[in-house]
Amino acid sequence: MGRLEGKVIVLTAAAQGIGRASALAFAREGAKVIATDINEAKLQELENYPGIQTRVLDVTKKRQIDQFASEIEKIDVLFNVAGFVHHGTILDCEEKDWDFSMNLNVRSMYLMIKAFLPKMLAQKSGNIINMSSVASSIKGVENRCVYSATKAAVIGLTKSVAADFIQQGIRCNCVCPGTVDTPSLQERIQARDDPKEALKAFLNRQKTGRFASAEEVALLCVYLASDESAYVTGTPVVIDGGWSL
Protein backbone atom coordinates (compact mmCIF):
# COMPACT_ATOMS: atom_id res chain seq x y z
CA MET A 1 0.00 0.00 0.00
CA GLY A 2 1.29 3.47 -0.90
CA ARG A 3 2.10 6.14 1.66
CA LEU A 4 -0.78 8.29 0.35
CA GLU A 5 -3.28 5.52 -0.34
CA GLY A 6 -6.84 6.85 -0.47
CA LYS A 7 -5.93 10.51 -0.01
CA VAL A 8 -7.45 13.13 -2.30
CA ILE A 9 -4.87 15.76 -3.21
CA VAL A 10 -5.56 19.00 -5.08
CA LEU A 11 -2.56 20.88 -6.40
CA THR A 12 -1.92 23.93 -8.55
CA ALA A 13 0.73 24.61 -11.22
CA ALA A 14 0.87 20.89 -11.96
CA ALA A 15 1.79 21.11 -15.65
CA GLN A 16 5.54 21.32 -15.17
CA GLY A 17 8.38 21.64 -12.69
CA ILE A 18 7.83 20.86 -9.02
CA GLY A 19 4.06 20.71 -9.49
CA ARG A 20 4.29 18.02 -12.18
CA ALA A 21 6.91 16.02 -10.29
CA SER A 22 4.76 16.16 -7.15
CA ALA A 23 1.58 15.12 -8.97
CA LEU A 24 3.38 12.05 -10.32
CA ALA A 25 4.95 11.24 -6.94
CA PHE A 26 1.60 11.57 -5.16
CA ALA A 27 -0.08 9.26 -7.67
CA ARG A 28 2.68 6.66 -7.37
CA GLU A 29 2.03 6.58 -3.62
CA GLY A 30 -1.67 5.82 -4.14
CA ALA A 31 -3.28 9.25 -3.94
CA LYS A 32 -6.16 10.42 -6.07
CA VAL A 33 -4.62 13.53 -7.59
CA ILE A 34 -6.59 16.46 -9.01
CA ALA A 35 -3.96 18.38 -10.93
CA THR A 36 -4.72 21.95 -11.99
CA ASP A 37 -2.93 24.48 -14.16
CA ILE A 38 -3.68 27.31 -16.56
CA ASN A 39 -1.63 25.57 -19.30
CA GLU A 40 -4.15 23.12 -20.75
CA ALA A 41 -1.81 21.58 -23.34
CA LYS A 42 0.89 20.71 -20.80
CA LEU A 43 -1.68 19.64 -18.23
CA GLN A 44 -3.22 17.09 -20.58
CA GLU A 45 0.05 15.16 -20.62
CA LEU A 46 -0.71 14.07 -17.04
CA GLU A 47 -3.99 12.41 -18.02
CA ASN A 48 -2.12 9.32 -19.19
CA TYR A 49 -0.99 8.54 -15.64
CA PRO A 50 -3.17 6.38 -13.36
CA GLY A 51 -4.60 8.22 -10.38
CA ILE A 52 -4.40 11.69 -11.93
CA GLN A 53 -7.29 13.75 -13.23
CA THR A 54 -6.81 17.27 -14.56
CA ARG A 55 -8.65 20.56 -14.41
CA VAL A 56 -7.78 23.84 -16.12
CA LEU A 57 -7.74 26.53 -13.43
CA ASP A 58 -6.58 30.13 -13.24
CA VAL A 59 -5.68 30.58 -9.58
CA THR A 60 -5.92 34.36 -9.86
CA LYS A 61 -9.66 34.11 -10.58
CA LYS A 62 -11.79 33.80 -7.43
CA ARG A 63 -14.92 32.75 -9.29
CA GLN A 64 -13.11 29.87 -10.99
CA ILE A 65 -11.64 28.71 -7.70
CA ASP A 66 -14.97 28.83 -5.87
CA GLN A 67 -16.70 26.90 -8.66
CA PHE A 68 -13.94 24.30 -8.67
CA ALA A 69 -14.08 23.92 -4.88
CA SER A 70 -17.85 23.45 -4.99
CA GLU A 71 -17.34 20.39 -7.21
CA ILE A 72 -14.90 18.67 -4.84
CA GLU A 73 -16.63 16.55 -2.20
CA LYS A 74 -13.55 15.45 -0.25
CA ILE A 75 -10.05 16.83 0.04
CA ASP A 76 -7.24 15.60 2.25
CA VAL A 77 -4.34 17.70 0.97
CA LEU A 78 -4.19 21.09 -0.75
CA PHE A 79 -0.82 21.87 -2.33
CA ASN A 80 -0.42 25.48 -3.52
CA VAL A 81 2.44 25.60 -6.00
CA ALA A 82 1.64 28.40 -8.47
CA GLY A 83 4.10 31.26 -8.54
CA PHE A 84 6.28 33.57 -10.62
CA VAL A 85 9.91 34.65 -10.21
CA HIS A 86 10.49 38.34 -10.98
CA HIS A 87 14.12 39.31 -11.59
CA GLY A 88 15.37 42.61 -10.22
CA THR A 89 15.78 44.97 -7.29
CA ILE A 90 13.05 47.23 -5.93
CA LEU A 91 14.13 49.83 -8.51
CA ASP A 92 13.46 47.35 -11.32
CA CYS A 93 10.04 46.47 -9.93
CA GLU A 94 7.22 48.60 -11.29
CA GLU A 95 3.85 48.68 -9.54
CA LYS A 96 2.40 46.32 -12.15
CA ASP A 97 5.22 43.84 -11.45
CA TRP A 98 4.61 44.08 -7.71
CA ASP A 99 0.86 43.62 -8.11
CA PHE A 100 1.24 40.69 -10.52
CA SER A 101 3.63 38.83 -8.21
CA MET A 102 1.57 39.47 -5.10
CA ASN A 103 -1.58 38.37 -6.91
CA LEU A 104 -0.14 35.11 -8.23
CA ASN A 105 2.28 34.19 -5.44
CA VAL A 106 0.22 35.16 -2.38
CA ARG A 107 -3.38 36.05 -3.17
CA SER A 108 -3.89 32.81 -5.11
CA MET A 109 -2.95 30.81 -2.01
CA TYR A 110 -5.29 32.92 0.11
CA LEU A 111 -8.12 32.22 -2.34
CA MET A 112 -7.41 28.49 -2.57
CA ILE A 113 -7.12 28.04 1.20
CA LYS A 114 -10.26 30.07 1.87
CA ALA A 115 -12.20 27.98 -0.67
CA PHE A 116 -11.07 24.57 0.56
CA LEU A 117 -10.49 25.06 4.30
CA PRO A 118 -14.22 24.91 5.21
CA LYS A 119 -14.39 21.42 3.67
CA MET A 120 -11.41 20.35 5.77
CA LEU A 121 -12.96 21.78 8.91
CA ALA A 122 -16.19 19.89 8.21
CA GLN A 123 -14.12 16.70 7.89
CA LYS A 124 -12.19 17.64 11.07
CA SER A 125 -8.96 16.97 9.21
CA GLY A 126 -6.93 18.56 6.46
CA ASN A 127 -3.41 19.24 5.29
CA ILE A 128 -2.24 22.36 3.45
CA ILE A 129 1.18 22.68 1.83
CA ASN A 130 2.32 26.00 0.37
CA MET A 131 5.29 26.58 -1.91
CA SER A 132 7.60 29.22 -0.50
CA SER A 133 11.35 29.62 -1.03
CA VAL A 134 14.64 30.13 0.75
CA ALA A 135 14.56 33.52 -1.01
CA SER A 136 12.13 34.94 1.54
CA SER A 137 12.46 35.87 5.20
CA ILE A 138 15.02 33.04 5.39
CA LYS A 139 17.70 34.53 3.14
CA GLY A 140 18.22 37.80 1.32
CA VAL A 141 18.93 37.09 -2.35
CA GLU A 142 20.11 39.62 -4.92
CA ASN A 143 17.64 40.62 -7.64
CA ARG A 144 14.71 38.83 -6.02
CA CYS A 145 13.00 41.79 -4.30
CA VAL A 146 9.31 41.25 -4.98
CA TYR A 147 9.70 37.48 -5.25
CA SER A 148 11.31 37.32 -1.80
CA ALA A 149 8.64 39.61 -0.37
CA THR A 150 5.90 37.32 -1.67
CA LYS A 151 7.58 34.17 -0.41
CA ALA A 152 8.09 35.73 3.03
CA ALA A 153 4.36 36.46 2.99
CA VAL A 154 3.69 32.80 2.20
CA ILE A 155 5.64 31.79 5.30
CA GLY A 156 3.57 34.21 7.38
CA LEU A 157 0.33 32.92 5.85
CA THR A 158 1.38 29.34 6.53
CA LYS A 159 2.15 29.99 10.19
CA SER A 160 -1.08 31.94 10.69
CA VAL A 161 -3.28 29.20 9.22
CA ALA A 162 -1.42 26.57 11.24
CA ALA A 163 -1.85 28.52 14.49
CA ASP A 164 -5.51 29.33 13.90
CA PHE A 165 -6.69 25.82 13.08
CA ILE A 166 -4.27 23.43 14.81
CA GLN A 167 -6.92 22.35 17.33
CA GLN A 168 -9.42 21.60 14.57
CA GLY A 169 -7.37 18.94 12.85
CA ILE A 170 -5.71 21.16 10.26
CA ARG A 171 -2.00 21.17 9.45
CA CYS A 172 -0.27 23.80 7.31
CA ASN A 173 3.38 23.79 6.25
CA CYS A 174 5.44 25.33 3.48
CA VAL A 175 8.29 24.06 1.35
CA CYS A 176 11.30 26.36 0.94
CA PRO A 177 13.55 25.20 -1.88
CA GLY A 178 16.77 26.74 -3.06
CA THR A 179 17.50 26.69 -6.79
CA VAL A 180 15.65 23.87 -8.55
CA ASP A 181 16.30 22.70 -12.11
CA THR A 182 12.91 23.32 -13.69
CA PRO A 183 11.63 24.72 -17.00
CA SER A 184 11.08 28.01 -15.18
CA LEU A 185 14.77 28.20 -14.20
CA GLN A 186 15.90 27.38 -17.73
CA GLU A 187 13.60 30.07 -19.15
CA ARG A 188 15.05 32.64 -16.74
CA ILE A 189 18.59 31.66 -17.67
CA GLN A 190 17.87 31.89 -21.40
CA ALA A 191 16.25 35.29 -20.93
CA ARG A 192 19.47 36.81 -19.61
CA ASP A 193 21.85 38.72 -21.90
CA ASP A 194 24.51 36.03 -21.48
CA PRO A 195 22.84 32.67 -20.68
CA LYS A 196 26.18 30.90 -20.18
CA GLU A 197 27.30 33.41 -17.58
CA ALA A 198 23.87 33.32 -15.96
CA LEU A 199 24.07 29.53 -15.64
CA LYS A 200 27.57 29.82 -14.19
CA ALA A 201 26.39 32.40 -11.64
CA PHE A 202 23.49 30.19 -10.56
CA LEU A 203 25.79 27.18 -10.14
CA ASN A 204 28.47 29.16 -8.29
CA ARG A 205 26.07 29.91 -5.45
CA GLN A 206 25.22 26.22 -4.99
CA LYS A 207 27.35 24.84 -2.15
CA THR A 208 26.73 21.31 -3.42
CA GLY A 209 27.82 22.29 -6.92
CA ARG A 210 24.46 21.43 -8.46
CA PHE A 211 20.80 22.35 -8.55
CA ALA A 212 18.07 20.39 -6.81
CA SER A 213 15.85 18.33 -9.07
CA ALA A 214 12.10 18.74 -9.07
CA GLU A 215 11.85 15.08 -8.11
CA GLU A 216 13.90 15.66 -4.94
CA VAL A 217 11.54 18.40 -3.85
CA ALA A 218 8.56 16.19 -4.73
CA LEU A 219 9.81 13.50 -2.34
CA LEU A 220 9.73 16.04 0.49
CA CYS A 221 6.21 16.98 -0.56
CA VAL A 222 5.16 13.31 -0.36
CA TYR A 223 6.40 13.25 3.24
CA LEU A 224 4.49 16.42 4.13
CA ALA A 225 1.34 15.10 2.44
CA SER A 226 1.56 11.79 4.29
CA ASP A 227 0.60 10.81 7.82
CA GLU A 228 4.32 10.37 8.53
CA SER A 229 4.45 14.14 9.09
CA ALA A 230 1.37 14.20 11.35
CA TYR A 231 3.25 16.08 14.09
CA VAL A 232 4.61 18.74 11.71
CA THR A 233 2.70 21.99 11.31
CA GLY A 234 3.48 25.68 10.90
CA THR A 235 6.92 24.80 9.61
CA PRO A 236 8.90 26.27 6.70
CA VAL A 237 10.77 23.15 5.54
CA VAL A 238 14.05 24.07 3.84
CA ILE A 239 15.49 21.98 1.00
CA ASP A 240 18.32 24.04 -0.45
CA GLY A 241 21.55 22.02 -0.43
CA GLY A 242 22.92 24.22 2.35
CA TRP A 243 22.52 27.48 0.41
CA SER A 244 21.03 29.28 3.42
CA LEU A 245 23.80 28.22 5.81
UniProtKB/Swiss-Prot annotation:
Pathway: Amino-acid metabolism; Siderophore biosynthesis
pH dependence: Optimum pH is 6.5. Active from 5.5 to 9.0 with 4-oxo-L-proline.
EC number: 1.1.1.-, 1.1.1.30, 1.1.1.104
Classification via InterPro entries: NAD(P)-bd_dom_sf, Sc_DH/Rdtase_CS, SDR_fam, SDR_superfamily_enzyme
Gene Ontology biological process terms from the UniProt entry: epithelial cell differentiation; fatty acid beta-oxidation; heme metabolic process; siderophore biosynthetic process
Catalysed reactions, semicolon-separated: cis-4-hydroxy-L-proline + NAD(+) = 4-oxo-L-proline + NADH + H(+); (R)-3-hydroxybutanoate + NAD(+) = acetoacetate + NADH + H(+)
List of residues binding substrate: 144, 188, 205
Top EC class for this record: oxidoreductase
Binding site for NAD(+): 16-18, 37, 58, 151, 180-184
Active site: 147 (proton acceptor)
Keyword Ion transport in annotation: no
GO molecular function, one term: 4-oxoproline reductase activity
Cellular-component GO terms for this entry: cytoplasm
Family annotation (SUPFAM superfamilies): NAD(P)-binding Rossmann-fold domains
Subcellular location per the Swiss-Prot or TrEMBL entry: Cytoplasm
Keywords, in A-Z order: Cytoplasm, Lipid metabolism, NAD, Oxidoreductase
PANTHER family: DEHYDROGENASE_REDUCTASE SDR FAMILY MEMBER 6 (PTHR43477:SF4), DIHYDROANTICAPSIN 7-DEHYDROGENASE (PTHR43477)
Job description of the protein: NAD(H)-dependent dehydrogenase/reductase with a preference for cyclic substrates. Catalyzes stereoselective conversion of 4-oxo-L-proline to cis-4-hydroxy-L-proline, likely a detoxification mechanism for ketoprolines. Mediates the formation of 2,5-dihydroxybenzoate (2,5-DHBA), a siderophore that chelates free cytoplasmic iron and associates with LCN2, thereby regulating iron transport and homeostasis while protecting cells against free radical-induced oxidative stress.
Name of the protein described by the UniProt record: Dehydrogenase/reductase SDR family member 6
